[in-house]
């Protein structure tokens, strides 16, 4: 039987949920404007900050990130179905479709955001250690330079360097598409950097598949997410190169 039906269903769910851009109805409801027509014209959390302020921007960022977590939870639910069609449902692969949906949403004529918040959600699902590192690096550079695009690019580059080390997953060796044997050793020692992957242990108890997403799957998913971020930040990269990128908040002038 085809054991990957769960991946297909969860990926479709992820794309459709990813296509929900919370910044659009929120800016319309709070200020009565279209986010596509004000600020940077981008329907993301950063532009929401410019239009509505930090609190609403944070709310949009959290809602966008939760789209990935909800999709992962949906995939977990499918993997618990005691049927071979769902026995090898990946929790990682469907999450990348949330980023695709966010950037090219079917509900908004394929005009989406830049998926930084969704990428953070992806890191939480694949390896929350990467999320913490990205988050720290992002805030350091955001505080110093006040440029979201620069902070996102540097944070992404940092994860790109670290993610090739098996120890960052809590395992001693590299695993390919099925990482169950590698991760079960780490889980038994209570080393769980890939927390969502742990739910494969419970699904295995239901149908005995002994399947878990491997490091390679996680790395491929993160790499695809990085490519999406670079593509969506192409104009920002040009502005950074030309030193014309505007800070999200200008530095306050010191009183003399």
From Swiss-Prot:
UniProt keyword list: Cell membrane, Lipid biosynthesis, Lipid metabolism, Membrane, Phospholipid biosynthesis, Phospholipid metabolism, Transferase, Transmembrane, Transmembrane helix
Location(s) in or outside the cell: Cell membrane
Pfam families for the chain: G3P_acyltransf (PF02660)
Pathway annotation: Lipid metabolism; phospholipid metabolism
Main location class: membrane
Top EC class of this enzyme: transferase
Membrane association type: Multi-pass membrane protein
EC number per UniProt: 2.3.1.275
Gene Ontology biological process terms from the UniProt entry: phospholipid biosynthetic process
GO cellular component, one term: plasma membrane
Residues that span the membrane, as ranges: 2-22, 58-78, 90-110, 123-143, 153-173, 211-231
Gene Ontology MF annotations: acyl-phosphate glycerol-3-phosphate acyltransferase activity
Quaternary data: Probably interacts with PlsX.
UniProt family annotation: Belongs to the PlsY family.
Xref: HAMAP family: PlsY
PANTHER family for this protein: GLYCEROL-3-PHOSPHATE ACYLTRANSFERASE-RELATED (PTHR30309:SF0), INNER MEMBRANE PROTEIN YGIH (PTHR30309)
Function as written in the Swiss-Prot or TrEMBL entry: Catalyzes the transfer of an acyl group from acyl-phosphate (acyl-PO(4)) to glycerol-3-phosphate (G3P) to form lysophosphatidic acid (LPA). This enzyme utilizes acyl-phosphate as fatty acyl donor, but not acyl-CoA or acyl-ACP.
Protein's UniProt name: Glycerol-3-phosphate acyltransferase
Taxonomy of the source species: Bacteria, Bacillati, Mycoplasmatota, Mollicutes, Entomoplasmatales
